[in-house]
Amino acid sequence: MSASPDQPADLVLSGGRIATMDPAHSWASALAVRDGRIATVGPDRAVMAHIGPRTRVIHLRGRTVTPGFQDAHVHPVHGGLARLRCELHDTRGREAYLAVIAAYAAAHPAEAWIRGGGWYMDDFPGGTPRREDLDAIAPDRPVFLTNRDGHGAWVNSRALELAGVTAETSDPADGRIERDADGSPTGTLHEGAMDLVGRYAPDDTPADLEAALVLGQAYLHSLGITAWQDAIIRPETEERAYVALASRGELTARVVGAMWWERHRGAEQIEEFVERRRVTSVGRYHATSVKLMMDGVLENFTGAMLEPYLDGHGGTTDNRGLLQIDPEGLSSWLSQLDAVGFQAHFHAIGDGAVRASLDAVAAARHANGPSDTRPHIAHIQVIHPEDVPRFRLLGVAANAQPYWACHEGQMDNLTIPFLGDRWRWQYPFRSLRAAGAVLAMGSDWSVSTPDPLLEMELAVERVADDSRGQKEPLLPEERLDLIDALAAFTTGSAYVNHLDGDTGTLEVGKLADLAVLDRDLFDRGAGAIGETRVVGTFVEGAAVFEDPALEG
């Protein structure tokens, strides 16, 4: 596989294992890059003719090179903000959280609000922390800390007081206030109830948002990620940051923006989306997707299920969760979005939300006929077995977050006991692939790690990286082979991002977006998949991340 070597290459990588991820899953040992595109892929000897006096040559010494990873569902602005604020993602346990929060409050006395997040529900009884713990640390300043999945918030009494949330406050239609027996708020807010307090927090400044995106982009590049789909784009926040960076030439990643569908509005949004797509597509940023939030999460019983949750002791309840968008309206709106070329990016956790999403796509197909909008459903935690083959039949990609597919506290204590036999329908990655679905992958960072290699390890092993050898795999029959997990983070996500014409594989003529790893990824004797590190990330042949070990 080679182009004419009339001009020397700008970059040559040789002596490695090049996972081209082309349709034949071909392997090579070297590649050459010229003018941002791949000029040659093949054996070392085929590349030698492309080396000139100014060619940068990197000797791989057996290390693996892959196409640049693409995250199909991520929140880099939020992830960057989390790293700039009270960051709890790397902390576990009530006492440890309180220590971090107290230290942050002491170090930032001028901040009007203490904001941040990353706490785990299973670190608290019933998954619900209390306001009194925060009151002891910050009685005079409002505290607003989201949990790791962003579907709940821990607040103090001052925040509730400022927002006027009391025992008399009704739950919003799309959320729930945790309460004591007398109706008083405990300090945990779920889903739409978070906005009862969050709306009073200071707006993020453009400078804050741009700094967060710069930080998030650098972090993702350090993990080999060269493209992503941002799963929530709002006009005054994320969109403004992307357009600012892209306009200055500082957006080095390729980004698809999924514009947020306001579930309290209707079809009038579509004309606004069309205009935003036109005026905000700058450089490597393109707003061509629309995010549809179908439900919540299982741990707080807001994930939409076809049948009710159990009560934890095997008894039935009347709670099927929250379907946040009316199915009848959704079918009409999705048909209109599809007709003007928008991709649908669904959040669907429960089997009821997954089915409603598939039904809406079916309605769009009936109304419009085939299209290349490539709808995808993110999270897909519980899928009714009858719906698995519908992904291929309807041309819907399965957008998986594999880091969640394991036994851990939230799974074992807050999910499985309330599902009954349906717990065996969770994260059916292998079944989806066997049924012919396109499988893409993402991290949902800052909900969980954005490291694609750790995510791939979970897809292959279905055991948490910190409990290897201690716990059984979650539904081991749904494990993927490593090559299929890698494909999901490269070719699959490139397909979802409509970037597969130029990226996703390492083939002659395609853009030289690639990741260099610190070892042979497929030599399982070299350590766990998740222990592999990225030492170099390139976009169009230009380094956007380099570890000293790249040349060492």
Q: Model regions: which residues?
A:
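Non-cysteine beta-strand/loop elements that form the S-adenosyl-L-methionine
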Residues: 282-302, 396-406
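Phosphate/diphosphate-binding loops
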Residues: 252-290, 374-381, 385, 411, ...
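Active-site neighborhood of phospho(di)ester-bond hydrolases with catalytic His/Asp-centered motifs
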Residues: 66-72, 378-379, 440-443
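Divalent metal-binding segments
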Residues: 3-15, 19, 23-272, 292-353, ...
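His/Asp/Glu-enriched, well-ordered alpha-helical/loop segment
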Residues: 332-345, 352-375, 385, 389, ...
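Acidic (Asp/Glu)-rich catalytic clusters
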Residues: 245-249, 276-282, 370, 392-393
